[in-house]
Every structure is written in structure tokens, then in C-alpha cells.
Amino acid sequence: PSNMNYLTGYDAWSFYYAQCVIVHVNADEPICFVRNQDAGGAYIKTYLKDENIIKYHEKYIHTWPLHPYDALVDLIKDRKWDKLSVGLEMDSHYFTAYCYEKIKQGLPNAKVLDCERLVNWVRVVKSDTEIKYMKAAAEISQLGMKKAFEAINPGVRQCDAVSEIYTTLIKGTPEFGGDYSSIVPMIPTGKGTSASHLTWSEDKFVEGEATIIELSGVNKKYHC
């Protein structure tokens, strides 16, 4: 999802269904391949021409053995790209083993390779605009941590404290608003501090017990 956003601007909350971006070395623009009902998000949020936003039919959703990548394979064949080298983000979140099998079986004449985090390596070098977003995220993160120190007190329910933290992180500042983060606030307390990634509960904070606070400020999807 993050690399789709980086390459096209697409950022709808649809990553739990099969979707992808195709980058051809000789094409002027990438192709954004999304579910039919999510195409509107691509039209709104990306810079792509309409013809480079390809939507697949709802019949491919939860109708095993049909799969959205059946439509993707057909797209690649229609473009006469099925005998080329095809680089995949093999360790990408939400790229399942079934996605891989559909591509491998559907494109027997292609040379299927691991692109070895190619887009991620490009993303390492940040533009001035990206650094601006990251600095904004840092300010929001500071506000969130300050609110955590204020809200976490003995006798306060963990969920009540987190609701104040969340509000602060999303509200941001008068200059720039916050965005949702890739993780929820982690707030293990007491014996929970022995486990790094526990979230909140309805239990109350207890005087004398330690609490770990992990959160992230976000601006335009850039985290700090």
C-alpha cells in the first residue's frame, strides 16, 4: 500500500483486497489496478490518466478459485507483456502466496523475479516536500506524547487516556492536520510492559506501575 501511494498518490483504505501498481519501463505512467468499487478513489487521489486506472469486477471477490489476479494476468497478456521479466515485491504486506501463484501459473512465459524492494530503495532519498511532511509529523508526535503524559494517571481507564491521545494526533495543529497511523497507540502497562506490542484495555492505570508509550504523528501519510 505504501509503495502504491508513493508511485501514484492512491491512498484509499482498500489494501486488504488485491490491488497493485504496474510500472512498465517504457510507459509514461504506471497502471493502478484496483477493485471496481475503489476506482473512484484512484480517479480522485492519483495523477494518472483514466485509461491507466484499471478496475477489476466484483465477481473476483471471495469467489475462490477466482481471484483478482486472474484479471491482472489477463491485463498483462492483453498488453503483450507476458513474455517479459516481471519484478514482484515478494516480501510486501498483503501480497499473498495465492497472489504469487496466480502470477506464476498465469504467466508461464514470463521471467518472474523478486524486485528486491526496488521502490523502497528509491524512497530512501527524500524530497524537500517529504521532509516537510515528516517535520509536521514530528510536531504532531510531540503533541501526542505531551497529551499522553497529561492523560495517563492512576485511576484513569486506559481507553479514556488513549481517546485523548488519538484526538490530539488526528487534530494536529492549526497549520496541518494529523492522519491515521500505520499502528495504533501501544500502551502496555504494569506486567504488560513485558510484552512490547499490547494495546489499551478498559483497565485503570495503577499508581507505581510502569507504562510504555508508543505512538506516531502522521501528516500526508508520513510518520514520525
Please name every model-derived segment.
Residues 45-61, 140-144, 165-177, 207-214:
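A short, terminal or domain-edge coil/loop segment
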Residues 34, 45, 99, 147, ...:
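A generic "cationic amphipathic patch" detector
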Residues 1-143:
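A composition/biophysics-driven feature that prefers long, compositionally simple stretches
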Residues 77, 108, 136-146, 150-157, ...:
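Generic secondary-structure signature for well-ordered alpha-helical cores
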Residues 4-14, 116-121, 125, 157-224:
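Short catalytic-site patches enriched in acidic/histidine residues
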